[in-house]
Regions:
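Sec-dependent N-terminal signal peptides
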Residues: 4-13
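Positively charged n-region of N-terminal signal peptides that target proteins for export
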Residues: 1-4, 19
Length: 131
């Protein structure tokens, strides 16, 4: 009986603490930390095969399918911008609580270039949404 209880405890514990794969789940709303791309990534290839350009309003996220449009709102100042997800983040960034890595243009609009990180809300929006 003790062995059965121990085995049951191990199974339940391992499933409760197992890491969930969130790659491309397309959540409607998500909260977390945003960062922005380093300048040395300019013109590098993204997960969609296109080149990353700091002047475009794009982002990398493991929580949305590629080519999903999301409104990103900086919770510290209320500014928002709509970006298209065209890349994936390194898993180590997601492990640090980051939900999106934005282009430099998007980070400028949101007003967190100096701090480098900010708390954000992400909301999935229809393709082509401007605001």
């Amino acid at each position: 009986m003790k062995r059965i209880l121990l085995l049951l405890f191990i199974v339940i514990s391992s499933s409760a603490f197992g890491q969930k794969d969130t790659l491309g789940q397309d959540l409607d709303t998500l909260y977390g930390i945003a960062s922005y791309y380093s300048p040395h990534f300019d013109s590098s290839k993204t997960a969609t095969g296109e080149m990353y350009l700091h002047s475009k309003l794009t982002g990398a996220s493991n929580f949305y399918k590629l080519n999903t449009w999301v409104r990103v709102t900086n919770l510290r100042n209320g500014r928002s911008v709509v970006v298209r997800i065209n890349d994936r983040m390194a898993r180590r960034m997601a492990a640090k609580g980051r939900v999106i890595d934005l282009s430099r243009s998007a980070a400028k609009i949101l007003g967190f270039m100096k701090s480098g990180l900010t708390k954000v809300q992400l909301v999935r929006v229809p393709k082509g949404t401007k605001k």
